[in-house]
Amino acid sequence: MSQKRNLPSWMSSRDPEITPSKSHCKKPKDEGPTEEHNSRNAPSNKSEHAEPSSNTTEFSKLMEGVVFVLSGFVNPERSTLRSQALTMGATYQPDWNAGSTLLICAFPNTPKFRQVETNGGTIISKEWITECYAQKKLVDIEQYLMHAGKPWRKSSSPQDANREKREHLSKKPEKQVEKKTETRGTPSTSSKNRSACNLVKEPFFVTEVKKWARDDLSQTISWLESQEEKPEPGEIKRIAAEGVLTCLQDAIDSLEQKQDIGSVTELWSFVPRVVKELGKMESSSKKENSTASKEEVCKQAKSWKKIYEAELAKPGEDESTSRVACGYDSDMTVEMTEEEIELAYRNVSLECL
């Protein structure tokens, strides 16, 4: 259950050119020493001995095929991001065009963001570049997606790229290939499985999930305020956020125990949208007789929970602006009588003399 949700290889961070068949080739036992020596030098087996390259060479090729554009950044941050991506083998372009594959964007919903979104391009946050550079490997790109579009790197083979896009999420891709060959004669069944599985594999945009979090918090606060027994005004936001996350965690626990999410929603008077969306994914996979399992829905739920935790931890606009403008916490205000004020004034005057 702790494994990360697998993505099609064009959306994952693994090198698409390296396959299990190339990295686990074995020699027949009956081959002699001479045949082994000749096979090492044969052109057909070069890929076996090409992998163990130096760390420097591998690092400089991590982002080969990535053609990126930067938007919303100023120096020195802009030059740092550009330098890091170039060091890992990516290609820089000053503006988006037909040859671009990836937009690294500082803010959502900017003119450049909408342009690339309309063109079907993939958009990520800067943290993916910095994490790849720091860890010296391609980290999972999913949590950094701001918009999932076309492949974020150019594939060496167009046929491979098309095939990779069609692959379903699965823990064991080998079994999935076998299943495709078995169901080749029944297109209606396979098409149902594909459409339902897409509900799980096609990620909601991160910006959309963040909006869910803000809306869920606002609606939970409104619900709490409408109750006869309501929390203190200074505690209501914290309690609302804890309630949303607790409900989401209950849904995750239910999925881990192979139970329906409906068993959770029945117990809560107010159900956040994120839990409702998970319930829709679960029920759709059942109706379509999909191969999508509770484990896949659970992985999606855990991914969304991380986004919710980060979004709900942010201070609200009213909270942050009031503290900056006023310079004090209103909860710390002390009421004083006229005599206390007069006494305090005299004490301050004496200290100043």
Curated annotation (Swiss-Prot):
Superkingdom of source: Eukaryota
GO terms under cellular component: nucleus
Bias type Polar residues, positions: 1-12, 184-194
Effect of a null allele: Reduced capacity to complete DNA demethylation initiated by ROS1.
Protein name: DNA-repair protein XRCC1
Main location: nucleus
Organism: Arabidopsis thaliana (Mouse-ear cress)
Coiled coil ranges: 240-260
Swiss-Prot/TrEMBL keywords: Coiled coil, DNA damage, DNA repair, DNA-binding, Nucleus, Repeat
Role, per record: Corrects defective DNA strand-break repair and sister chromatid exchange following treatment with ionizing radiation and alkylating agents. Involved in DNA demethylation pathway by stimulating cytosine methylation (5-meC) excision, gap tailoring, and DNA ligation.
Location(s), subcellular: Nucleus
